[in-house]
Amino acid sequence: RDEFETDLVAVLTEEQLELWPPLQRQLIRDRLLPRGRLSGETLDVMGLVDEQEYADEVLLALLPALKTWDVNVTDALMARDNQMVENQGVLMSSMRTMDVSTGIDVLKMQGRLAETVRFVNDTAVEQIVLLLPADKTNQFKAIAQQRSYPRIYRATRTDRAYEDALELEELIPETLQAIMNLQDSMDDEIAMANGQLLSATHRGESQEQIDRMNRFAQRMSGGTTERADNPIDHAEKAKREIEDRYLELLRDLLTEEQIEELGGLKKRETREERRGG
């Protein structure tokens, strides 16, 4: 690939050479962004902005933030990719020889570089939200959150249950208003829970890969393989408890027939319940 790019640059005209650096960065992004493993690491900020089809004056206002992201994310992606290529053999060797400490050092560095890519993306989104007209900020922020962190911001079954409940026929006005009030309260609590889950994701997601390597080493040596305590698990559990509580509150407002029309509104089984524990 490098040889091809060198040959290509050699035949470009002076005018074409001026266009080469941004094109080269785009080629790097297209190749390396999809390889991200962390939430938020694969977000194509420029592509996301392009999808919104903003007016020219809006795009001009966003141009400084997009240029900064273009340069910074390309540098971060190259640093991440170079480290992975240079240390792939070291990582494989550490797994064969059970040299866990060396392997963990490599994974920690990979995690830090991946977090840098994510930070560049998150920062760009924050800057764009500040630069957008007020009537466009909420929509863009919501789309970026769902695209970057679907594990956190995608609609839940409880969200869908409330939306479907509001569409039920023959709801008396008092019940309709009560459902709307509960939905507002739930949205506030879920927003707080999502913030805590986002913080836990930033703290603990790259650690999960290290924990997996530790469990692999423990299994190979005949030791126990218990899952390490993870802040993401605790934050997800707290969010599920909120969802389940509001699902019960919704059930209390509806008749049995209405509950059946909404699919039963049963709480989601825990991992232990699915295993029969």
Where are these regions (language model features)?
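Charge-rich (acidic/polar
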Residues: 1-277
